[in-house]
Amino acid sequence: MTDTPDTPDTPMATGASSRPPLRALTPLEGRVVAVLLEKQFTVPDTYPLSLNALAAGCNQKTARSPVMSVGEDEILTAIDGLKSLSLVFEGSSSRVPRFEQNLARVLGVPSQSAALLSTLLLRGPQTAAELRLNTARLHAFADISSVEAFLDELAERDPALVVKLPRGPGEREHRWTHLLCGEVSLAEAPGLRTSASIEIAPSELEALRISHRELEDKVARLQALVEEMAEQLGISIDPDRLS
């Protein structure tokens, strides 16, 4: 086991932590190291993972965002990159190559934080409540506030490992995302586009204009019909009430 020992559900109050710069991971590198950490807790009997099991975890259809479809050659390339960062090791006690992760030790974070980071890598941006639910098999956080405490500590590190995203339209809670694959564009983060940022194609805009003109024509014809019927019935109608 390469993870740091468990600590209580409160980050150590030692101020903002710093670490040597770690290059941004590729999306596949992030997926590989996160799958290894996940499977270490969910299927410990098969950990360290074989290449075949690792590929299955990377291409898993559930609990993954985005869903990937990658081959073993691509995964081996990602493993080589992770080995160069000491984030992944290859075991030597089996005839079949097996791989294990070293995320917590390299980043200098407790196992609770590593669980949060791996879940963000696997599932994308999530609220603290979602993270508490989705990390349950990796670490059972006591409550949402303890999740937020670890997220805040990760955000205060130098460099930061996570960031809190602005609330999008209709969202009640802030979501968090990891920064292990580089900085994120808040304007392009999922669910954060506002109505002002929505682009309408020229053809769609012209169709809206035509529809608007047709609607105006129908209203005008109905108004004329009402006025004609009122005149036939001898009813006086204020034109302003029809506009």
UniProtKB/Swiss-Prot annotation:
Gene3D superfamilies: Winged helix-like DNA-binding domain superfamily/Winged helix DNA-binding domain. The keyword Zinc-finger does not apply. Keywords: Plasmid. Residues 1-11 have a biased composition (Low complexity). Residues 1-23 are annotated as: Disordered. InterPro entries: DUF480, WH-like_DNA-bd_sf, WH_DNA-bd_sf. The keyword Aminoacyl-tRNA synthetase does not apply. It comes from the Bacteria. Belongs to the UPF0502 family. This is UPF0502 protein Rmet_3697.
